[in-house]
């Protein structure tokens, strides 16, 4: 079983990764999701995957999601939340699909924690 932290879950690569995970529940478990501000898409992903944590780096979007969502997934916000997803103990692999510089710092943090990077 691969335990994955998915950074950039609402983008094209992230959405495809979610589809693959849903099609292979005995092989892939998404433990953490992270996105910028697509709170409605992230909420759908949370409901489908039931990760341990989910992050929106846009704090306003995170506040909107927190008001609506009352499940077990912990909702985090901002860069601190993104770093938590990148270094999450429950994941052995970080799939870094964030665009540009925004993904560099969390990816480096994941490497420093010994995570596999995809």
Regions found by a protein language model. Name each.
Residues 1-54:
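N-terminal Rossmann-like dinucleotide-binding module
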Residues 12-16, 102-105, 116:
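Gly/Ser/Thr-rich beta-alpha loop segments that engage phosphate groups in nucleotides
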Residues 18-19, 47, 66-68, 106-109:
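Short amphipathic alpha-helical segments
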Residues 29-32, 55, 94-96, 118:
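Short catalytic-loop micro-motif centered on adjacent basic/acidic residues
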Residues 31-37, 42-80, 86:
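Glycine-rich nucleotide/cofactor/substrate-binding loop typically near the N-terminus or early
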Residues 49-51, 90-91, 115-116:
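Glycine-enriched alpha-helix->loop->beta-strand junction motifs that scaffold or abut catalytic
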Residues 77-109:
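Beta-loop-alpha module in the N-terminal Rossmann-like domain of NAD(P)-dependent dehydrogenases
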Residues 108-118:
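Beta-strand-loop-alpha-helix segment that lines the small-molecule cofactor/substrate pocket
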């Amino acid at each position: 079983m691969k335990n994955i932290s998915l950074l950039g879950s609402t983008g094209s690569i992230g959405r495809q990764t979610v589809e693959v995970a849903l099609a292979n529940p005995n092989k892939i478990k998404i433990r953490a999701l992270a996105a910028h501000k697509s709170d409605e898409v992230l909420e759908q992903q949370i409901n489908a995957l039931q990760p341990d944590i989910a992050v929106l780096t846009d704090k306003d979007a995170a506040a909107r999601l927190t008001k609506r969502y009352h499940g077990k997934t912990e909702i985090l916000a901002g860069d601190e939340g993104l770093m938590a997803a990148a270094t999450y103990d429950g994941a052995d692999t970080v799939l870094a699909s964030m665009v540009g510089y925004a993904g560099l710092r969390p990816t480096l943090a994941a490497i420093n924690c010994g995570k596999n990077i995809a």
